Amino acid sequence: MENEKKSGDKYSKLAGNTLIFAISSFSSKLLTLIVQPFLTYAMAEISDLGLSKILSQYANLLIPFVSMGMSNAIIRFGLDKGNSEKQVFTNGLLTILGGFGILVLCWPIAQFLPDMAQYGLLIYIYVLMSCLRTLCTQFVRSRQWNKLVAVDGVLCTVATMAFYVLYLVGFKWGANGYLLAIISGDLSSVLFLMFTGKLWNYVELKGVNKDLWKQMLRFSLPMIPAQISFWIINASDLFFVREMCNGLDGRDGNAWSGLLSTGYFLPTILTTLGLIFYDAWQLSAVTEEEGRAKFFTKIFRTYSSVLFCCAAGIIWLCRPVMHIMKSNYYYAWHFVPFLVLASTCSCFN
């Protein structure tokens, strides 16, 4: 009887965490679902949207190197009650600042990369703010302040949407405005978590625990190749399409990248489900120890069934849904079935 109760508690806890993270993650992904049609009208040309996506993916490629994969270590070591919360947070912060310092030193070389000379400053700020926001949200999650995570997700979504409207519709800043809106949204999130969670109390620069730091790095550094692999799977196609399709059907490379990124609009629903579940699963996978094999098997079967049903529905509805985009983006529906299949496989990773 007692074992059944404990088993039920495990499922209830996972369901509760999933619901809380759904509020947080769904709000941020809802932003993507709302913003993508909005961007097709706010951007003057398809190529402007394509360039914006390319620039943001430059930043996303740099993030694992700057953070050194520390976001994973924050959860792993933050949940371990034997570690000092202050040391975990401080080590994560110092790692990110050190990684960003190395990135700054690489500027003389980085400026010669495509688009970097014109947009490099914004890309660098984007990387730093994204790393800091991830640090704060992961630490708050490791403290199991899950409701605060949910509120932060909603706040960041609203703030970013407001900045999109301000920079793209009000100031008409194009690609610059797109990057600035994301930067401003991340900054809003960092400030909110800092003040509500009083995270400055967890910064302890004196007596840094170097042994713990080494353990965290040993855990996080092997994650970098995995994160880069995810980037290659999910984002490198934008760069290949830009170079290989340049001039095809009278469109430049950025325009084709813009169409492809619009095609990601519906598969984002699948990746959203996967990310929501993964955030909750991280906690249960670490904290639940009894009956793990049966628990894991049952959850995987349910998870895979939901994914396959959603994938089939998205492919069925892709053409009519694409009518909500600006008319010259309708061609993007051709990409959707292939991207849905790829997203389904990615969710199982």
Predicted regions and their residues:
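Interfacial transmembrane-helix starts/ends
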Residues: 15, 53, 83-97, 217, ...
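Helix-loop junctions and terminal segments of transmembrane helices
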Residues: 37, 66-82, 263, 267-293, ...
